[in-house]
Amino acid sequence: MSWQAYVDEHLMCEIEGHHLAAAAIVGHDGAAWAQSTAFPEFKTEDMANIMKDFDEPGHLAPTGLFLGPTKYMVIQGEPGAVIRGKKGSGGITVKKTGQALVVGIYDEPMTPGQCNMVVERLGDYLLEQGM
């Protein structure tokens, strides 16, 4: 299965009538492996800061998590494994695997829990596959 198929079929899938606003799978080096059409353009620096927060939990708390032009307030995640962010009625979930970051962005009516479930389910699967 191609990385794009993982994004299209597993991240952008419908959950209780809703789906993510955007999603991507990005390498630890910041290079996008696959992404949905609405995924924002981001800087390598954005991904470097996210990676640093996985290594040093709390790194993003003072400044927020930036993905392109959007700033998310970092909320409780799982140190070293999952970062969650909130902006208004939407937010972001980032799951770290051995080689990649699985990123999901949501807006209402999708809930944070639905976003977490979609992103973390694929991330856990990739971890099981050694990815």
Swiss-Prot record:
Subunit note: Occurs in many kinds of cells as a complex with monomeric actin in a 1:1 ratio.
Gene Ontology MF, one: proline-rich region binding
Family from the record: Belongs to the profilin family.
Gene name of the record: PRO2
Superkingdom: Eukaryota
Residue(s) carrying Phosphothreonine: T111
Disulfide bonds: C13-C115
UniProt PTM: Phosphorylated by MAP kinases.
Expression sites by tissue: Pollen specific.
Hydrolase in keyword set: no
Subcellular localization: Cytoplasm, Cytoskeleton
GO terms of biological process kind: nuclear migration; regulation of actin cytoskeleton organization
Function (record text): Binds to actin and affects the structure of the cytoskeleton. At high concentrations, profilin prevents the polymerization of actin, whereas it enhances it at low concentrations. By binding to PIP2, it inhibits the formation of IP3 and DG.
Entries under CDD domains matching the protein: PROF
Keyword annotations: Actin-binding, Allergen, Cytoplasm, Cytoskeleton, Disulfide bond, Phosphoprotein
Lineage of the species this protein comes from: Eukaryota, Viridiplantae, Streptophyta, Embryophyta, Tracheophyta
Protein name: Profilin-2
UniProt xrefs under PANTHER family: PROFILIN, PROFILIN-A
Short motif (Involved in PIP2 interaction): ranges: 81-97
A cellular component annotation (GO) from this entry: cell cortex
Note: The variability of the residues taking part of IgE-binding epitopes might be responsible of the difference in cross-reactivity among olive pollen cultivars, and between distantly related pollen species, leading to a variable range of allergy reactions among atopic patients.
